[in-house]
Structures are given as structure tokens and as C-alpha cells.
Design a protein with these regions (language model features):
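NAD(P)H-binding glycine-rich loop region in Rossmannoid oxidoreductase-like domains
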Residues: 1-27
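Long, contiguous hydrophobic alpha-helical segments, chiefly transmembrane helices and signal peptides
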Residues: 5, 34-37, 53, 57, ...
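N-terminal/domain-start segments enriched in small and hydrophobic, helix-friendly residues
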Residues: 7, 24-25, 35, 145-148, ...
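Detector for Asparagine
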Residues: 8, 30, 55, 152-154, ...
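Rossmann-like NAD(P)(H) cofactor-binding subdomain of soluble oxidoreductases
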Residues: 18-88
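C-terminal substrate-binding/catalytic lobe of Rossmann-fold NAD(P)-dependent dehydrogenases
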Residues: 67-72, 81-243
Length: 243
């Protein structure tokens, strides 16, 4: 069961470049909508796996988990961010996206963490690939990170909404579950380690999330994940205070 009720980014004012809240700006509006909708969904489909696609994604996953106690809950997470990461790298490096391995973890939002240390092109680490090529690594990084984090805003500015990207990801995650593909993808779910819902590499199949993988991130990336966790915990405290 795909859960996507709520106000979108443009209508909710989360489409402004430089906005420090980003998708979290939608939290106070979509919170009561989920509190109304989720119990009704559970009553209608008590055995359904719940796939959340509403922003702010990770807090909505956590809220759904609380409202649907004991049910299987996950969210599209940073799957779309990771695809944007690969696409941006492919454009800059003139390499097919299928030849690139790249992950975005943490919040599906402004505190997301691009795992640069794990990027490979044809199984070759990015730093090794760039050595001897006339590509400035820092310039590449700034350009790609802006594209990944602001990509939704640029799409909304151009056509009013960003439905096709997330629609493709929703369809793919549903397919993975229905076919029991047991594929490792960056989706959002509650993490016992971090105490909040966020995106990590997880093996997904017909029973939802089957495994959670621990990434050997470098110090900078781990600090980024910690900041993402704190941002999401702060968001959940806002929800708790609203009740």
C-alpha cells in the first residue's frame, strides 16, 4: 500500500532555493493528515506493507510506524537522491549511469549525505578515476551536491511539480517487494542504532526490509549522518509537541 497523502512542496512553500527547512517545512501540515489517514488504511488493509512517499519523508515514515504499530513500514527514502547522484556524475564524467555506483544516505532532504568515498566507476574508486583527468574534484563535488539537494526545486520551478521522479521510484520499490527481489537499495525505515527513521542500504523483498547494512563511511560522512539524525530527531520532537 503506497501512502502519499498530504500537501506537496510547491503548495507547502518548500520549493524556495536556500530555504533552511526544505521539505521539513511540510511537517506541520502533513502530520494531522497522516494521523487521520493511516488508521483508516490499517482498518481497510491490515496485512498491507506500507510504503510512504509523502514529504517530509523520514518523519512521515516514523509517524506511520508509530500509528501502525507492528505493521511493516518503509519509505522511498534516498533512492531518488541516489539516482540523481548517479545521473549528475554520469553527465560530468561522460559515463553511463549504469557504470556508476553511488549512494545517498540519511534524510531525504537538505541534510542528506552523499557517500563520495564509496563512489565507483566500473569498480574503480572515484579519486583513482579522476587522477590524471582534467576534472577538478572539488568543483565536481559542489556541482553534484547542489544538483542532488536542489534537484526537486529546479524541477518544480520548471514544470510545477516533481511527480515523475518519485513515481518511478515508488513503482520500482513496489516491483522489488512484489517480485521478492531481495535488492539492496537506500530506503527509509526505523533504525534501532540511530533511534529514528532514515535511509540506509537495506535489503528489500516480499516481507519489506529484510536486512540493514552498516556502511564504513569516512569521518566526514559519518559526521554528516550524525547531523542528519539530529535534524530528524528534532523534527520528531516537533510532532510530539503538537499532540
Amino acid at each position: 500500500m503506497v501512502l502519499a497523502p498530504g500537501i506537496n512542496e510547491k503548495a507547502g512553500g518548500a520549493d524556495k532555493p536556500g530555504d533552511k527547512e526544505g521539505r521539513l517545512r511540510l511537517l506541520d501540515t502533513n502530520d494531522p493528515i497522516f494521523r487521520d489517514v493511516v488508521p483508516k488504511v490499517i482498518a481497510a488493509a491490515p496485512d498491507a506493507i506500507l510504503l510512504v512517499a509523502t514529504n517530509p519523508l523520514d518523519p512521515m515514515v516514523e509517524l506511520t510506524r508509530r500509528l501502525a504499530s507492528g505493521k511493516i513500514v518503509l519509505g522511498t527514502g534516498t533512492f531518488l537522491d541516489s539516482l540523481r547522484f548517479k545521473t549528475a556524475l554520469a553527465d560530468h564524467l561522460e559515463v553511463a549511469p549504469e557504470s556508476i555506483s553511488a549512494l545517498v544516505l540519511g534524510e531525504h532532504g537538505l541534510s542528506s549525505v552523499l557517500l563520495w568515498s564509496k563512489v565507483t566507476i566500473g569498480a574503480v574508486l572515484l579519486d583513482t578515476y579522476l587522477a590524471g583527468r582534467s576534472i577538478d574534484g572539488q568543483t565536481l563535488r559542489r556541482s553534484v551536491e547542489e544538483y542532488v539537494r536542489q534537484g526537486n526545486i529546479n524541477v518544480i520551478k520548471g514544470k510545477g511539480a516533481s511527480e515523475f521522479g518519485i513515481g518511478t521510484v515508488v513503482a520500482r520499490v513496489v516491483e522489488i517487494i512484489l517480485r521478492d527481489d531481495c535488492m539492496v537499495i537506500p530506503v527509509s525505515a526505523y533504525s534501532e542504532k540511530y533511534g529514528v527513521a532514515l535511509s540506509l542500504p537495506r535489503r528489500v523483498g516480499s516481507s519489506g526490509v529484510l536486512d540493514e547494512f552498516e556502511i564504513e563511511a569516512n569521518k566526514e560522512e559519518q559526521e554528516g549522518i550524525s547531523r542528519s539524525v539530529e535534524a530528524l530527531k528534532t523534527a520528531m520532537k516537533r510532532l510530539d509537541r503538537s499532540q
